Every structure is written in structure tokens, then in C-alpha cells.
From Swiss-Prot:
It is found in: Cytoplasm. The lineage of its organism: Eukaryota, Metazoa, Ecdysozoa, Nematoda, Chromadorea. Keywords: Cytoplasm. The gene is clu-1. This is Clustered mitochondria protein homolog. Residues 30-39 have a biased composition (Polar residues). Residues 329-579 form the Clu domain.
Length: 1247
């Protein structure tokens, strides 16, 4: 993260006015600062902003504004970001002649005051400094090159399409038709779904240097080292001249070495010693001197959001084909990526390995009492966790490439374990039959996911007293690899000696520890785990022990003295619908539950448990309150003083009960009436106890491996778990299905669908249940859900095949599998036969043919059908993928994309013509289409709770129309996120989008466009170029660009969004109708009526097809269609469309609504115009211009803006005086804005 606000530079600045400002984007809203201290926070140290001067060793001095809590190290990053100083890396900062510490806060530096001057002093080079310098040179020169698609599949460099769109106002008045009219692939009804348009157009390459490499003469011999030589490098310029360069302590100079002759002394022709390689090249290479300024200009044109690396690895499922003449040599890359012992930070920490566990635990335990302490703690923990995930991703790829030796190489490959870079890796197989009774390999695979869910649950606790391991899961090339940090001392002793809490023999023997009880009590309470007693038997002696978690959880005290808890796979209660011998509700039985499942580790999600407990609590409160209300009513009717007194006492005690419940405290009722009310309510809601409300879950109540104590009421405990599962089946799933049918939620792809299901507490295994309920529906969600079932079932089938494939067969096998899916393969693969034949010949013996080689279309489809039935409970009747996609209107390209993404396959971006009937008989895919595999990463994602709370508060303010308060809260949330995460994070686009909408409502068009542009770029780079969220960001960006009257700038994101929607889903989606309505309205505004009509008619047809024909948006679209017909002179069609508008408005609002009256008036106008037009047509002669015969009444710009706002879910309620709000400068400005402006940003409430 960089810092500061500085004139003429491209560095990050503090959050001001709720925005993360970047220089040269001067769209200040004028709103007051939102960074006010929270009085509720104890001991908060208020940050101060100071202005300092920095005097670089080259170039002019410059001023910098920064917060005094920044680290000095961030000043270094500021200098590396500046154009004038980015090429110098070996320096120190001095204040008053004293070097300052890199890792201290600036406020802690003696003499650091407002107005002071820091001097940059060049330091002598070491080999570490030299290597870091060369890396910086390489990073700078990469800005002139196209994105290299063929570097490792998991990188931190992601592309952005929006960099190709100009959103700046231009001087020319009229845009060209080519700037406005759509490309062919964005037209309604377009059948072309080529992936080639998905890639970002690349600018012309700026090549300043051919290669820079370490010389084979390294390291410097002793005599030269004593004279200051550090490193030797060879540089090949664009003029094809090779310069042998010596890096000495003073800098870089050209030496006298030649091919085959070593002479590191200073060259006779160029005796200058340069501080940087860049300065040296500018003096020896004219080509470099010419191109380098252009590279810097291109770099400066990119904002921080566009060019900074992402925190976590990102991948794309498409890329450019490998061209031998386009793959450039890079000696530094060759060294970094071909040496398996390199861990990625040797140049920063030479000779050291990071202790990930110590770093994670130390930062996790940092104090968090005040908000400033929490920011520091969250920022440190997030940064280290991101480094850990990046390191683990690199390790996983090296392991499966065979570059890392297992710690148990003599055992079966599936049991191999690895330690690399102080990270422990294990494969997702059932080693030593640990999960034999639970499902074998399937259970072992699922256990890692449920374990990660447990880690996430413990990490969300406010003050966890126990430590969990750093953990990440990777699905790569068919394997599941789990990466974990290493507990100190765990490898030095047997597991039996390490575990002090839990069981290591599947529940037969359980150990417990009072210290762990104290630490687990609070965690178990917050996670709604019920303390329970089990029986442990050892050496014939039985003992009753109390557990706060499942017996599977293990407590280990590390050599560092910390108390760790791991194996948290049973932190949530089991899902009884997938346990063969479990009792389920009657409703579940009618739906065919319990069902046989590949494993017995199915668990309910925490979101469901929270929703279920909240629902039961509401029911409990309602029942007890009703009992007391009935008593009060009875006492009043009978006028019995005794009853009145009892009712008053009961009402008082009930209030105390409710207060205790709200504060999460225990309460013992003494009043007999209240006691009876509580008992009755507890019986209805199935409380764990008869006489008090407790809704907690025993995670072991359905486990047969552990013996329960006789005192445990298993019947009640199991009934609560059954009720929770029934709540999922009878309330949450029907609620989601109805929301999908009503278009309340509008997922675009499988990732969006999974997120929505998880938010509602629904596991992915219930996809089949949702699919059944949507099967006969016209909802847009039906093809989405069913295609996701097929994609996930295909993933399960292909995963089993991939683990049997050697590295040399990956391209052939993957292309063959895709051909089996999307074309017709009747015979085994000839490629496979050749591969097997060569392998058999090489080994001199017969080998078993690979599973993929005999695969055919029918065999693969039958396997997918079997998996769909066994895993998702959804029987696929169609006997081929072709019939299945036709039956359910599934777009093949969307299904193809989803399968590639869940498999982690990267393919060449070209037109595969999956819907071409002639291509089905041939091989659509070839080996060269497969570029690479990339890992699918799952991990616990640290977050800042303070930012989330502020964002929720802002959303609440937004929902009641308090725009000013909402803007401040969400701006403060973005401020906190920036302090913790840096410039980019997946949570930030949501904040920026909300700020953009609020700015739009408040009339700040520039701010709205600026914030939304950042949101869209972040979404592209962090989530994906074709992700569902990215499409939504494009629509919002187009909206605000239109508000700024940037017509081409508003249409190009919409055309891109339409192409992506056609690729990701297809046309029959409410978001596609929204896109077409936007395009049609904007084209109508610029009088491109014929093209506008195509889009408006498409929007109207889609809206009616997906089952929402009678809504406000439909009426608005019909009105626009009528006006477009009228503008074209087709009054008969205009009348038909407007009559439909009138009918919709009448049904929605009744006869006297302004919209109904307006539509009625427009019908009369159209009728009059049609009559007038017909009369003039009768008098027509050859000299008459037909366009002069009618005068269409165009809508006002204001009405068009209002229509666009409603289509995109923004309702602005204006009041008199709104237009003058921006001009008010008195003390009541803020109050008047809050009072006069109400913004409702919920899309569906408009309908």
C-alpha cells in the first residue's frame, strides 16, 4: 500500500470526503470529512495529517501529505511509484542527518514535524539490493509489453477491459456513428458466441530491451569482490548489442568483458558509474532512450487500481494461443520459475524461511480494543494471510509438477505428505482408512471443506482464546491439496502425546482438559454448540468426560505455549437428510429423504443455523408474550384484582426475560405464570431444556462412533437438529425458489447462484431439490440451476479421471473429454491409443490403458447422469447433452464456460461453434486449445468487522432515504477497508457502487462516475472479466456515464455487458432485458431509432418470456417502444404499444394515477398525429419529403433520465428546492439535503 497526496504524482492518498482519491481524478464532491472519531471507542488515538518535503537524490523536491500513523516503508513505495524516482531502488531516508527506521511509524521518528524535509541518500549496493533493483527494472519495462498469458496460471496480475474505453469528455460535439452503433456480436438475437472478444485488446508493444540476464561469470571472484564487485549481468539491447555490466557497491558500469573473455574492469569507452541500470541504458542504447519515456507514460496513465497486483492469485479460463514467435525470452523469469527450491522472497529475506504459523498467530493475537488497534491488527493479519496463500499456491503447483520430494516417499502416492516453505501439504485421499466408515475418499475430500468452514467460524469470533491453523484448499488437476501452517513441535512427537483434548481413534478414547474447557466455553456458546458428556474407555476403565465441541476436534498445546484447536470438521450440526439411518421430518420423508450420499460428513451451514435460531427465538417470544397478553385480557374482563396483580407481575418478569435474551444472558423465571408460558413455548419450539429456552446443537448426537453419557437427552438434541434441517427444506429453499421466480434475486452464473444459496444457508448439494421445483417453471433460473448441476457432476466425474493421468497426457485427455461432452465421440481416442502405445514400447511392458482413452460421449454422459442422481438427487431423463440443453433451453457456451471454470482449465479464446450442427460430428477441440490448468482456491478470508458494520449501517440509512448519513457511513467503511486491505479487495466494489449511486442521487455526477469506474475495474481484476458482478458494474458505469452525457462512454460498457451476458447465460435473463432497455433508451436519445427499436423490442420480449409481464419496467419499455415507433412514423405500431402501456399502468396503479393519465394523454396525441399523418399522405406528391409529414413529440431529457433511473433500480424523490441544494453554503445545508432527498436503491421495490 502506498500513501500520501502529492501534486503531479501517481500515488495513493488518504480517503477524503468518503472517496479513495487518486491524483488527476479531481471530482471532489464537496462533502464534509467523514473521518470523525467514534466516541464509543476507548483510547482512540486520532491520526494527524502532516505536510513534508522529500528531496530525492535525482530530480526536484516535492511535497507530500500523509497521516502520521503511516510506516516509513510506505514512503519508499511512494518514491518507487513516482516517475522521476521509480528507477532508483537502493536508498535510505534521512531526517536531520540521521537515517530513519523503515518499519517505524512516522510519528515515532524524533524530529518528524509538519513541514520537515526528508532527504533521499543513495546507499551502497549488496547482492540483495542488486537483485531487487533488476526486479524493479523488469517490472517497469513490463508496462510496455502485452499481458503474458503463458506465465504461471496463478498470478497476481489481472487485466481490465475498461482501460480500452475513454470516459473523458471530448471536445468534438458529434460522435461518429461508429462510436455509437453496436458491433455485430452485441446485437439482439446474435448467435455468435466467440470467445475471441472476451480478451482485452492489447496496445502496441513497446520493447525497450531484448534481455537482461545474470552473467555466467557470477559470483565475483575474491579479488574482484574485495574491490567492490557485487554482481555481473549481460544486457542485450534492441540494437542487438550485448553489454557486459558490472554491479559494484557504487552502482553499474559497462565492463571490458567480451564473449569468452572475463574483464570486469571499467570500459575504456564508457567510464561512468550509474546509480541504476535504467540510467546506464539511456546512455548506451538509443532505442531504449526513445522507448522508455513512452513506457513510463503508459504506466502513469494507469491508476493504482489498474496496475497494482492483486492480494490473492487470480486466473482466467481463456487466453491467447501460444505463438512461438511471440513468446519472448526472459532470463530472470527463467531463473525464478524453474528452480523449485525458490520460495518467492529470497531477494527480500536471503537464506531465511518465513515461519508462517508464528506470523499468523502473532498478528491474530494483536490487541483490538480500539478501532485504531483493530485497523493495525487487521491490516497485519490480512497481509500475512495473503502472502501465505500466495506461497501455498506456488507450493501446490510445484508438488503436482513433481518438483518437491514427499516426506514419506516410500508410501503410496495418495498418502504422500509434503513440507515446503514451512507449509504442510496433504492430498485429499483417505489415508490409513481414517474415513472408511464415512465414505472413504469422498469423505476425506469433503472433510477438508467442512474443516475450513470450522476455521472460518472460529475466526469470526470477537475475542478468540484459541488458535487455529493457517489453512487453504486447492483443487488442481483433479487433486485436492490442503495447505496448513505447522504447529511448533508437532512433527517431533507422536499424535497421542500431542492431543490433550478430543479423540484420535474415532471416538473410542476421548481426552479432555479443563484449560480447554475454559477457552472453549465462550466459543461454543457463540457458535451454538451444546456442551455434552461422552464416555471414554481406556484399558477397560470407563470415564465420563465433558466436551464443548465434537469429539473430532483436537486440542494441541504447541511448543510455543499456544493452545491450538484443529480438525473442526464437525463444528456445525450434521445434515440428517443425508444420513441413511437418521430420523427426518414428515415433510422430508415425502420428498424422499433421508437420501444415500457419497459420504456421511454433510453438515448444515452456519448461515442456516443463525437463521433457524433467530426464527425459533421470534416464535418463542411471540408465544410467551401471547400467554401473558391473554392473562392481561382475562384479568381486565373479569376485573379480578388477584388476576390483575398476577398479570402485572408476569408482564414485568417477562420484560426482564426478553431483556436477558437480547443481552444473551441467562434468566431464571420465578413467576408461576411466566414459568408455565416458558414451558409451553419451549415445548412448541423444541428447546433443548423443558423449563428454559436454549437452542444449541450437539454435533455428536448422530455419531455412532462415540458413546454418550446416560444423562444426555439425545432425543431432544436430535430433534433440534432434525428441525433445523426441516427448516432448510420447508422454508429456506421454497423462499429462495419463489425469489428466483419473482426475479427478486437474479444470479447470472453458477458462482452468483452458489453465493446466493450460501447466504441463505443452503448447501450446494440441494441444487437438485431447487432444480426439481423449477423444472416446470418459465423462470430464468431453471436453465441456470440445471446447467450448474451438469457442470458440477461433470467435475466429479472428470476429477476421478484426471488423478489417473500423467502430465504428458493432460492436453490430450482434456481435449478428448471436452469432445465427448460437446460433440459426438463414438470410438476411443486415437490420440490416447498412440500415447499408450509409445508408453508401452518405452517401458517394454504392457500398461493398463488410461481411463480417459476409452471414454465416449455416451459413457461420459451416463456417468454424469449417475453422479447427478447420487449427489444432487436430480435424475436426468435426457439420454444426451444435446437433448438436455434443448429441453431446458440451456446455452451450450455458458455450460462450457462453467465446466472449464469448475475444472480449472484454461483454453484458447476462439469461436468453438458449439451450436453448429456440422461441428458435432467432428472434433471441436484439439490439444493446442488447452493452454493450462489453474488451481481453484478456497481459504479463510480475513475481513475488517468495523468496515462491515459501517457498511450495514449505511445500507440501513439508505433504505430509509437518509442519503447524507448513508454516504458518510459507506464512505467511512471504504476508508477502513483501504487502511486494512490497500487499494483493492473484493469487498470494495460493493462500497464504491453504493457510493456511486448515492453520489448520483445527490447530483454529484463526476463522483458517481469516478467511484463506479473504480468498482468496475476492481471487479474485472479481482472477480473476473466475465463474472456476473462485472456485468452489473458495467451497467451501473454506463448509467452514470450517460448521466455525464458521455454517450459513447455509456454505450460501450453496455455492448460489452450484452456480449458477456450472451456468453455467460444467454438472452432470456432479466439482466439482459435491463441491458437492452438501457441501450435502446440511449440510442433513442441520439435518434438512432431503428437500432433502438431492436433493443427495446428485445427487452420487451425477454421480460414477457421470463414471466414478469406486468411490472413498472415493462410499462416503461412499452412506452419507449411507442415513442420510437412514432419517431419513425409508424403510428399504428405506436398505438398498439402505448395501449399496452396504458393497460399495465391501469392494472398497477388504478385509474387516477399520474402515469395512467399521462399514458392516456399520449394515446390521444398519437391518435391525432396518426389522423393528421394519414390526411397528409393523401395529398402526397413526388416532391414531398415524407419526414416533413409528421412531427413526433420527443420526451424531455429529464423524463429519459427518470426512466433510466427506474430501469436500473434508482428512484429519486425530488422536492421543491432540490435544484438549489448544491448552491447552499449556510449551516443548514447538510440537514436540508438529508430532509429533501430520499433514495431508494432496492431494485425490486420499484415494481
Amino acid at each position: 500500500m502506498t500513501l500520501g497526496s502529492e501534486t503531479k504524482t501517481d500515488v495513493e492518498v488518504p480517503i477524503i470526503n468518503g472517496k479513495h482519491e487518486i491524483p488527476q481524478e479531481e471530482n471532489d464532491s464537496g462533502h464534509s470529512s467523514i473521518n470523525t472519531p467514534d466516541s464509543s471507542e476507548p483510547d482512540k488515538q486520532v491520526d494527524k495529517f502532516v505536510k513534508i518535503t522529500i528531496q530525492p537524490s535525482c530530480g526536484d523536491a516535492f511535497e507530500l501529505h500523509l497521516s502520521d500513523n503511516e510506516l516509513v516503508q510506505e514512503l519508499y513505495q511512494t518514491l518507487l511509484d513516482r516517475e522521476a524516482t521509480c528507477h532508483r531502488t537502493c536508498f535510505s531516508l534521512y531526517l536531520n542527518g540521521t537515517a530513519v527506521d523503515n518499519y517505524s511509524e512516522v510519528r515515532a521518528i524524533p524530529g518528524f514535524v509538519d513541514g520537515c524535509t526528508l532527504n533521499v541518500v543513495d546507499e551502497p549496493y549488496t547482492i540483495r539490493d542488486a537483485r531487487l533493483h533488476l526486479r524493479q527494472v523488469r517490472e517497469l519495462l513490463k508496462f510496455g509489453l502485452t499481458e503474458d498469458q503463458h506465465e504461471p496460471p496463478c498470478t497476481n496480475d489481472a487485466q481490465s477491459y475498461l482501460t480500452t474505453i475513454n470516459l473523458q469528455p471530448e471536445e468534438k460535439k458529434e460522435p461518429k456513428p461508429s462510436d455509437i452503433l453496436p458491433p455485430d456480436h452485441a446485437l439482439p438475437g446474435c448467435k455468435e458466441r466467440s470467445l475471441a472478444h472476451l480478451l482485452v485488446p492489447q496496445p502496441k508493444e513497446l520493447i525497450a530491451l531484448k534481455d537482461i540476464a545474470f552473467s555466467p561469470y557470477n559470483p565475483p571472484p575474491g579479488p574482484r569482490k574485495l574491490r567492490g564487485d557485487v554482481l555481473y549481468i549481460d544486457i542485450t539491447t534492441v540494437e542487438n548489442r550485448i553489454y557486459h555490466v558490472t554491479c559494484c557497491t557504487r552502482g553499474f558500469y559497462v565492463n571490458n568483458s567480451q564473449d569468452g573473455r572475463f574483464d570486469p574492469t571499467v570500459s575504456n569507452s564508457n567510464k561512468t558509474v550509474y546509480q541504476s541500470v535504467i540510467e546506464l541504458l539511456q546512455n548506451v542504447s538509443p532505442g531504449f532512450k526513445k522507448v522508455y519515456p513512452q513506457i513510463l507514460k503508459r504506466r502513469q496513465e494507469k491508476t493504482l487500481v489498474e496496475r497494482l497486483p492483486t492480494s490473492y492469485p487470480v486466473s482466467s479460463w481463456v487466453g491467447n494461443p501460444l505463438k512461438t514467435d511471440g513468446y519472448m525470452s526472459d532470463s530472470l523469469r527463467a531463473i525464478e520459475l524453474t528452480e523449485p527450491f525458490r520460495v518467492g522472497f529470497e531477494d527480500h529475506m536471503p537464506g531465511l524461511l518465513r515461519d508462517w504459523n508464528e506470523e499468523l498467530q502473532t498478528t491474530f493475537e494483536m490487541t483490538r480494543k480500539s478501532i485504531s488497534e483493530r485497523v493495525i491488527r487487521d491490516r497485519s493479519y490480512y497481509k500475512i494471510h495473503a502472502d501465505y496463500v500466495n506461497a501455498a499456491a506456488r507450493g501446490v503447483q510445484s508438488i503436482l509438477d513433481g518438483n518437491i520430494l514427499a516426506i514419506n516417499p516410500g508410501e503410496d502416492k495418495k498418502t504422500h505428505m509434503y513440507i515446503w516453505n514451512n507449509i504442510f501439504f496433504s492430498l485429499g485421499f483417505d489415508v490409513r482408512d481414517h474415513y472408511k466408515e464415512l465414505g472413504g475418499d469422498a469423505a476425506a475430500f469433503a472433510a477438508t471443506s467442512t474443516d475450513l468452514q470450522g476455521v472460518r467460524a472460529f475466526a469470526t469470533l470477537d475475542d478468540p482464546k484459541l488458535n487455529t491453523l493457517g489453512m487453504a484448499i486447492f483443487d488442481y488437476r483433479g487433486y485436492r491439496v490442503t495447505a496448513q501452517s505447522i504447529i511448533p513441535g508437532i512433527l517431533e512427537r507422536e499424535q497421542e502425546q500431542s492431543v490433550v483434548y478430543g479423540s484420535i481413534d474415532f471416538g473410542k478414547t476421548v481426552v479432555s482438559d479443563e484449560k480447554y474447557h475454559e477457552l472453549l466455553e465462550d466459543a461454543a456458546h457463540k457458535l451454538k454448540m451444546l456442551p455434552h458428556t461422552v464416555i471414554s474407555e481406556k484399558d477397560g476403565v470407563k470415564e465420563e468426560l465433558k466436551l464443548y465441541t465434537s469429539y473430532e476436534a483436537k486440542g494441541i498445546i504447541g511448543n510455543d505455549g499456544r493452545k491450538y484447536v484443529l480438525d473442526l470438521l464437525r463444528s456445525m450440526p450434521p445434515d440428517v437428510h443425508y444420513l441413511d439411518d437418521a430420523e427426518v421430518s414428515e415433510a422430508a420423508k415425502t420428498l424422499g429423504y433421508p437420501r444415500k450420499f457419497p459420504h456421511k460428513l454433510s453438515a448444515l451451514r452456519r448461515e442456516l443455523i443463525d437463521a433457524f435460531c433467530e426464527s425459533r427465538l421470534v416464535t418463542f417470544i411471540q408465544l410467551t408474550a401471547k400467554k401473558i397478553r391473554d392473562l392481561i385480557t382475562e384479568s381486565k374482563e373479569k376485573n379480578d384484582e388477584t388476576l390483575i396483580k398476577q398479570a402485572a407481575e408476569a408482564e414485568t418478569e417477562l420484560s426482564l426475560l426478553f431483556m436477558a435474551i437480547s443481552e444473551d444472558k441467562e434468566f431464571e423465571a420465578k413467576n408461576k405464570v411466566v414459568q408455565d408460558a416458558i414451558k409451553e413455548a419451549c415445548a412448541v419450539v423444541h428447546s433443548i431444556y423443558e423449563d428454559r429456552y436454549v437452542m444449541k446443537f450437539n454435533p455428536d448426537c448422530f455419531s455412532s462412533n462415540v458413546k454418550h453419557a446416560p444423562t444426555e437427552n439425545l432425543e431432544r438434541q436430535r430433534r433440534v437438529v432434525v428441525d433445523a434441517a426441516d427448516f432448510l427444506l420447508t422454508q429456506k429453499i421454497p423462499e429462495l425458489v419463489q425469489n428466483l421466480k419473482d426475479c427478486v434475486v437474479q444470479p447470472i452464473d453458477g458462482d452468483n447462484l452458489a453465493d446466493i444459496m450460501h447466504i441463505n444457508g443452503i448447501n450446494i448439494r440441494y441444487l437438485g431439490e431447487i432444480g426439481k421445483r423449477l423444472e416446470n417453471s418459465v423462470s430464468f433460473a431453471r436453465p441456470l440451476v440445471l446447467s450448474d448441476i451438469v457442470a458440477r457432476s461433470a467435475k466429479h466425474v472428470i476429477r476421478k479421471i484426471n488423478v489417473q493421468i500423467t502430465a504428458d497426457q493432460l492436453s490430450a485427455s482434456t481435449s478428448h473429454i471436452l469432445n465427448c461432452l460437446f460433440s459426438v465421440v463414438l470410438d476411443p481416442s486415437p490420440i490416447a491409443a498412440n500415447v499408450a502405445k509409445k508408453a508401452n514400447k518405452k517401458n517394454g511392458k504392457k500398461r493398463v490403458t488410461s481411463a480417459w482413452s476409452s471414454l465416449t460421449t455416451s459413457a461420459l454422459w451416463n456417468s454424469i447422469r449417475e453422479d447427478s442422481a447420487s449427489y444432487y438427487g436430480y435424475p436426468i431423463e435426457a439420454d444426451s447433452l444435446e437433448k438436455f440443453t434443448e429441453l431446458h433451453d440451456i446455452q451450450k457456451t455458458a455450460l462450457f464456460r462453467r465446466i472449464c471454470k469448475v475444472m480449472g482449465v484454461q483454453l484458447v479464446a476462439r469461436d468453438y461453434q458449439l451450436d453448429n450442427s456440422t461441428a458435432k460430428k467432428t472434433s471441436i477441440f484439439v490439444e493446442d486449445d488447452i493452454i493450462n490448468f489453474f488451481p481453484i482456491i478456497k481459504h479463510h478470508e480475513p475481513f475488517t468487522a468495523d468496515a462491515k458494520k459501517m457498511f450495514i449501517r449505511g445500507q440501513q440509512a439508505m433504505s430509509i432515504g437518509a442519503s447524507r448519513e448513508a454516504y458518510e457511513c459507506i464512505g467511512e467503511s471504504l476508508n477502513l477497508m483501504t487502511l486494512v486491505y490497500g487499494v483493492m479487495h473484493p469487498d470494495m466494489p460493493q462500497c464504491l457502487r453504493a457510493l456511486a449511486r448515492l453520489s448520483h442521487v445527490l447530483g454529484e455526477t463526476g463522483d458517481a462516475l469516478n467511484n463506479q469506474h473504480k468498482a468496475a475495474v476492481m471487479s474485472e481484476r479481482l472477480i473476473g472479466l466475465d463474472a456476473g458482478n462485472t456485468i452489473i458494474e458495467y451497467i451501473n458505469l454506463a448509467h452514470f456515464a450517460f448521466g455525464a452525457l458521455l454517450i459513447p462512454g455509456s454505450l460501450r460498457p453496455l455492448y460489452r455487458a450484452r456480449y458477456l451476458m450472451n456468453l455467460v447465460f444467454g438472452e432470456k435473463h432479466p439482466v439482459m432485458a435491463q441491458i437492452d432497455a438501457n441501450i435502446g433508451l440511449i440510442l433513442f436519445t441520439v435518434q438512432e431509432f431503428d437500432t433502438a427499436l431492436k433493443y427495446l423490442q428485445s427487452a420487451d420480449a425477454i421480460t414477457k418470456t421470463i414471466g414478469e409481464p406486468r411490472k413498472l419496467k415493462t410499462g416503461l419499455i412499452s412506452n419507449l417502444i411507442a415513442r420510437t415507433h412514432a419517431a419513425r412514423g409508424d403510428f399504428r405500431a405506436a398505438l398498439v404499444a402505448e395501449k399496452e402501456t396504458f393497460a399495465i399502468y391501469s392494472e398497477l396503479y388504478g385509474p387516477n394515477h399520474p402515469r395512467v393519465n399521462e399514458s392516456s394523454e399520449y394515446l390521444r396525441t398519437l391518435t391525432q398525429q396518426a389522423v393528421t399523418f394519414q390526411k397528409k399522405m393523401l395529398k402526397l406528391d413526388n416532391s414531398t419529403n415524407i419526414t416533413e409529414l409528421f412531427q413526433a413529440q420527443p420526451p424531455t431529457v429529464t423524463s429519459l433520465f427518470d426512466t433510466l433511473n427506474i430501469i436500473n433500480g434508482i428512484l429519486i424523490i425530488g422536492v421543491p428546492g432540490l435544484s438549489s441544494l448544491g448552491k447552499q453554503q449556510n449551516g443548514t445545508t447538510e440537514e436540508s439535503k438529508t430532509t429533501d432527498v430520499a433514495a431508494q436503491l432496492d431494485n425490486e421495490t420499484l415494481d
